[in-house]
Amino acid sequence: MNTVKTVRELRAAVARARGEGKRIGFVPTMGNLHSGHAALVTKAAQRADFVVASIFVNPLQFGANEDLDKYPRTLAADQERLVQAGCNLLFAPTVEEMYPDGMSVQTRVSVPQLSEGLCGASRPGHFEGVATVVNKLFNMVQPDLAVFGEKDYQQLAVIRAMVRDLNMPIQIIGEPTVRAEDGLALSSRNGYLTPEQRTAAPALYRTLQHIAAGIGRGQRDFAALVAEGQAQLSAAGFRPDYLEVRHAVSLRPAVINDRDLVVIAAAYLGNTRLIDNLYLHLEEKTA
């Protein structure tokens, strides 16, 4: 695996691979990689001939009071993990390389509606930052396909919409969430948890499972199920940001006739914000 730091080097390396007739796969990350990221790269390697990963902690998607400065930078360990997962090329640019004229004058990409509510409500500007940097990376790499984790469900929906609306010839692949044995979704932010918080953290996924099980049994009072779930989270030491049942594609609030749903949540344990979701498909009842 080669590592490049400039757009010029990136484009030259991708052009060589494409000139050899290779299908290009892409996995954008912010580094501090774990097994969940490795699964994305492995999926890309299964679907493409040449896999590009990027590591860039994007300031544009962090709010004023968020953890940009303390976000871990672990390049050497990340490079080793990428090699093991089957990555061919790592793009690790500086902020200056990505935003040469500064972020204040950077053209922004905004995906309306899908970016609003849920994480967008408590993190204003976050998805604009995500859409902008992913758009830039797509233009730099020009991949045939890109792989994103389903743990960041709203982000995946935003990116799918951006690619569709802007007619980008890129296949977007969602990879199922990788979990620890106790059910906690793998996340770079799990490292911020104290041992006690880490023990409590799986309650987030158990709450989603509880709500999904109720829906599966035929309960359609989503508000009542969510209220139960919020009580469970609070009892486990969480401070819920949101917990909702949404339509799995449009992310609008679910209605009783919906067949594809996602139970989606964000909650704080101490100062650490964790997110998770659980998709469920309901079969239509036959007479």
From Swiss-Prot:
Pathway the protein acts in: Cofactor biosynthesis; (R)-pantothenate biosynthesis; (R)-pantothenate from (R)-pantoate and beta-alanine: step 1/1
Annotated ATP binding sites: 30-37, 149-152, 178, 186-189
Catalytic activity: (R)-pantoate + beta-alanine + ATP = (R)-pantothenate + AMP + diphosphate + H(+)
GO cellular component: cytosol
Gene3D superfamilies reported for this sequence: HUPs (3.40.50.620), Pantoate-beta-alanine ligase, C-terminal domain (3.30.1300.10)
Catalytic residues, chain numbering: 37
Annotated localization: Cytoplasm
Miscellaneous comment as given in the Swiss-Prot or TrEMBL entry: The reaction proceeds by a bi uni uni bi ping pong mechanism.
Record's protein name: Pantothenate synthetase
Annotated organism of origin: Pseudomonas putida (strain ATCC 47054 / DSM 6125 / CFBP 8728 / NCIMB 11950 / KT2440)
Name of the coding gene: panC
